Amino acid sequence: MQSWSETAVPSVPGQGPPLRLFDTADRQVRPVTPGRTATMYVCGITPYDATHLGHAATYLTFDLVNRIWRDAGHDVHYVQNVTDVDDPLFERANRDGEDWVVLGMRETALFREDMEALRVLPPRDYIGAVESIGEVIEMVEKFVASGAAYVVDDPEFPDVYFRANATEQFGYESGYDRETMDKFFAERGGDPDRPGKEDPLDALVWRAVRPGEPSWPSPFGPGRPGWHIECSAIALNRIGSGFDVQGGGSDLIFPHHEYSAAHAESATGDRRFARHYVHTGMIGLDGEKMSKSRGNLVFVSKLRGEGVDPAAIRLGLLSGHYRQDRPWTEQLLADAHTRLQLWKDAAALESAPSATDTIARLRQHLADDLDTPKALDALDGWARRALDHGGSDTNAPSEFAAAVDALLGVRLRRP
């Protein structure tokens, strides 16, 4: 699947401290220690609707990780999937009387446009679930052969399920107790009451063909992949086990990331799928989480269509800490526009105070678990000093603009 266009990233003199991120599995902020090539997998969209601000906040978070690694001199192998075969896509297509393939392609194209407008650096591998069917089948075959998975006793729909106890470390990623797992499994796409399952928490890895659904041939009969195994297969086949960061929204902690890890660990025998599990908070509107099921969405494409500067959208979402649940408001967007203009005015000066210390603070705050509120405050301070008191450093405005562009993805000057 085609990704979106790369945007140029300026080079900024100097180097920041090593990146530290909160790891969901270890429940602490700790260093991320990639090799020469940093590796990251972020779960992508199910393309049955446009990109909302909750999506955007997640992808902006991991765009910062990408930029920080690049600033530190790493090559970055970033992988993102598209869940282009799944129940919500089929349900929306049926509701609207549209071909599910056409719907998925259209919404994926709109997502790419939104990401490009927000200046999110594209993944090296942008992979649809449909493209990874063969890889999934190989994994399911391995599970069945090893006893990690079984076929339910249902002649009509012989689905294949992964045993939740197939790995002894199951549950380490989320840290949830059984009661919480049962609750979220039922709420987030699981099927605990499916007849024939050995354990309500056993996860679907191959869904036998149903009337009106697409299917692919397999040794277990025609069907399609379960949700979690798609990400396991795509990640293992592009960046392997033990990659640096797996990312997504906090609603993916369980079941999706727990099972993606368990599937991969069962397939490889490794103890840990990813070295860091990093999750973003939810974006709310009117006191509730922004979600398709609630219908309280603010779409990036709609804001762009209304003439909102994508850079202001970006700054608005970065104004809060990535791990916090936080609201989106009109005032937040207005403040982001004000901040953007402040920075642009300062970057347009012919001379200003030295920006060296400010750039160092920007790097320091971002390296400290992506502390964007402090990073943005530091930039505000320099911009106000430059506009109010001036300075004699003729390189400072361009250095400031380059750092904001490279590390935050916000362009202050015309190229």
From Swiss-Prot:
Chain positions of motif 'HIGH' region: 45-55
Positions annotated to bind Zn(2+): C43, C231, H256
Keyword Protease found: no
Cofactor(s) required for function per UniProt: Zn(2+)
This protein's UniProt keywords: ATP-binding, Ligase, Metal-binding, Nucleotide-binding, Zinc
Residues noted as binding L-cysteinyl-5'-AMP in the record, renumbered to the chain: C43, G44, I45, T46, T58, N81, V82, T83, W227, G249, S250, D251, I283
Family matches, as Pfam families: tRNA-synt_1e (PF01406)
GO cellular-component term (any): cytosol
Domain of life: Bacteria
Region entry Disordered, spans: 1-20
Quaternary assembly: Monomer.
Family the entry assigns: Belongs to the class-I aminoacyl-tRNA synthetase family. MshC subfamily.
Protein's recorded name: L-cysteine:1D-myo-inositol 2-amino-2-deoxy-alpha-D-glucopyranoside ligase
Organism: Rhodococcus jostii (strain RHA1)
Organism lineage: Bacteria, Bacillati, Actinomycetota, Actinomycetes, Mycobacteriales
The gene coding this protein: mshC
